[in-house]
């Protein structure tokens, strides 16, 4: 095991901050919550989804009849702003919460999540399975209890489902190594979340993919031309 | 990994963008011809030059993942990542316990419902979309 794929909490917070910057640009709804003593914190997002019904008539653009709202449109609106088509009485709105925390023991990020109906009734794990994308179902169904466990949220102290982090460094390593070969800075959080998110119904908009490489900054060209100029003048 | 040579089965020689040395069989795995699958087409039923319908995808293996003998494919724009998963898994004969990841920009996994046409618009260059793929035991 090499050290590259592990990082400390500070690095975790840095990547989260960069991730959230982009989220804010595109209105994707992620925010940072610090713990009471501000020594640590986590990233979180809430989104609403209609189960077993037609699409929520939200700005009239969603044509998804399946269970997911496109993430780009699933902003985090206050409930009274959410335009639910009143005629879809068979539909129920489910509130999904996703939290990204740092695991000190595994030294990787961990995805915590939970879902509940609007009246507060929590969804059971088997209900959450229905939202898992087909391509992950096969593998996850083989041993769901190996991969998703219920644990107490380290900061909130409430029960959440957790995507077990024991394999995270293993599947992140090839990706990171590959990127390092071409000297590209990868936002670990972006990359990791893009991979694990869909398994629990969380999809990242494509723009995150290009945001990560933009963070490297383009200072070189400008600075050197300025330097050249000043040299010439003298 | 020396995996740069590929056979462009579905491209008529005259339109092949890179005039490369013919197929170098990858030493690690000799994968058989793909099962006929609706997901991607190695066939010649329509010229790839008609970029409205199909796009070129170049598949590159990451880590210890087996390298596909044929890396270049012409794929309908509306095909999803999910469709590519199914195709590659069959081609590489992955078992259910193995998870496959597909990346753009070498580091970002698009959601399974994403269409390759959109990915091509955003991340394609030199007339093709490069996708990296990696198998792993992501869970458990």
Curated annotation (Swiss-Prot), chain B:
The keyword Cytoplasm applies. Residues 1-52 are annotated as: Disordered. There is a cross-link at residue 140 (Glycyl lysine isopeptide (Gly-Lys) (interchain with K-? in acceptor protein)). SUPFAM superfamilies: Ubiquitin-like. Residues 20-42 have a biased composition (Low complexity). It is a peripheral membrane protein. It is found in: Cytoplasm; Preautophagosomal structure membrane. Gene3D superfamilies: Phosphatidylinositol 3-kinase Catalytic Subunit, Chain A, domain 1 (3.10.20.90). InterPro entries: Atg12, Ubiquitin-like_domsf. Acetylated by EP300. The keyword Protein transport does not apply. One of its GO terms (biological process) is autophagosome maturation. One of its GO terms (molecular function) is protein tag activity. Its main location: cytoplasm. Shares weak sequence similarity with ubiquitin family, but contains an 'ubiquitin superfold' and the C-terminal Gly is required for isopeptide linkage. This is Ubiquitin-like protein ATG12. It comes from Bos taurus.
